[in-house]
Regions:
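Non-globular, low-confidence helical/coil segments that flank catalytic cores
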Residues: 2-230
């Protein structure tokens, strides 16, 4: 079965707004159609980041697309936003088949569901260290700055609100990926203007409140959602 994607390519070169950092090349973002789930690939220069990997049945489709269509054998950063199956279900398959340099996941000790158990098992087999990122930490993906603007490593009762929220800045353009973070998290975020917003929690009413949307003022929003889901 093929994997449908929606691709966004942002070519800035030196054409950035005044006072914005000068960057070269393009930022490519692949939004994978995994139904009621999330998976996004980001490329800048020769660096790759995969945010989530959909449901269990999506893992092999994502691997096939990465290898066969994009000829990717390694990923610099793999981000599991939180432990729900529709986000990390395919992560174990990705780890089994793609060389991962850095793996970020919120701290969790209960490991109640098989999906997260599988992820920990495969990571251990591959000697892949799991990093529990901290708010304010950042890293570079090529010339794109990636900042952890929220994560809860204290295992909140609502797993959605443990989600890693990632802000990416490329030249003058900003992007926000918020996993399934709900309004309690959104109320704490101070991320400024966002050009392209990956809508939290599949566009459900528990996220993307009117106040939050007003504050980030996105130019575009991307919603990853299953057929006839609302």
């Amino acid at each position: 079965m093929c994997l449908l994607t929606q691709t966004l390519t942002l070519q800035l070169g030196n054409h950035t707004e005044k006072n914005a950092p000068s960057v070269e090349g393009a930022l490519e973002i692949y939004y994978f159609d995994v139904g009621q789930g999330d998976s996004t690939l980001i490329k800048q220069s020769d660096d790759y980041m995969l945010i989530d990997a959909g449901n269990n049945e999506d893992g092999q489709k994502i691997v096939n697309y990465l290898k066969d269509n994009l000829h990717i054998d390694n990923i610099d950063y793999l981000i599991g936003t939180h432990s729900h199956e529709d986000h990390i279900g395919g992560v174990d398959t990705v780890i089994e088949n793609i060389d991962i340099k850095n793996f970020y996941l919120p701290h969790e000790t209960t490991l109640e569901k098989k999906s997260i158990q599988d992820v920990y098992k495969v990571a251990k087999e591959k000697n892949l260290q799991i990093t529990n990122p901290q708010i304010g930490s950042s890293f570079q993906l090529g010339e794109a700055k990636c900042e952890i603007v929220f994560v809860d490593n204290n295992e909140p009762e609502e797993k959605n609100n443990s989600s890693i929220v990632l802000k990416i800045t490329f030249g003058s353009q900003t992007f926000l990926f918020s996993g399934d973070a709900e309004y309690d998290v959104e109320s704490k975020l101070d991320v400024g203007k966002i050009n392209i917003y990956k809508a939290g929690h599949h566009g459900s009413k528990s996220s993307s409140t009117a106040d939050f949307i007003k504050r980030i003022d996105p130019d575009y929003a991307i919603i990853s959602v299953g057929y006839l889901m609302n």
